[in-house]
């Protein structure tokens, strides 16, 4: 490799670099930490999307660094470890795409490429399909309507809905299966507010029913 492109640093140069860029690196790491710590769909969809971009970039950056280490290994032991880490990183990156594509085929939603989870909650509200990521494999899901605002597991989906608009079934799509949740309880608090509880009732290997004519996946990334 060209030494002018990849110069050899000594310890003094590395310390000088850290002194000059310490503040900037600290601010960048602080921002990334805050985004990763507080980026949830129930808080801010914009921050959550930034978090997803950061997580998505982690693997390709890791692959680049491990390949770089293969060319600049300190000895044969580090070379062997660098090659091993490179292979592992590439294999995991490929598996991520394979699983994401399989989930996309099942749901038709771009949320399938979410690097944080392979669980996608799907709810049909008056012919409009909402798809959102859920982190855990819940046994129950809670839908709440507050003055026309619809929330599922604390995540706001849309407005202009009533308890009567809630479907009987909600699904959670995974790479291998599609879990069906049946409405088991509904409580009306007042005219425009209430909640419903959906309980997991069936698990099977089938696709989410398509409703493209009703705009199934045209606004899946909206808060």
From Swiss-Prot:
PROSITE patterns: COV_M. Its main location: virion. GO terms for molecular function: structural constituent of virion. InterPro entries: M_CoV, M_HCoV-like. Signal peptide: none annotated. Belongs to the betacoronaviruses M protein family. Keywords: Glycoprotein, Host Golgi apparatus, Host membrane, Host-virus interaction, Membrane, Transmembrane, Transmembrane helix, Viral envelope protein, Viral immunoevasion, Viral matrix protein, Virion. Component of the viral envelope that plays a central role in virus morphogenesis and assembly via its interactions with other viral proteins. Isolate N5 belongs to genotype C. Genotype C probably arose from recombination between genotypes A and B. One of its GO terms (cellular component) is host cell Golgi membrane. Residues 1-20, 73-80 are virion surface. This is Membrane protein. The lineage of its organism: Viruses, Riboviria, Orthornavirae, Pisuviricota, Pisoniviricetes. The keyword Membrane applies. It is a multi-pass membrane protein. Homomultimer. Interacts with envelope E protein in the budding compartment of the host cell, which is located between endoplasmic reticulum and the Golgi complex. Forms a complex with HE and S proteins. Interacts with nucleocapsid N protein. This interaction probably participates in RNA packaging into the virus. Residues 42-51, 102-223 are intravirion. The chain crosses the membrane at residues 21-41, 52-72, 81-101. HAMAP family: BETA_CORONA_M. It comes from the Viruses. It is found in: Virion membrane; Host Golgi apparatus membrane.
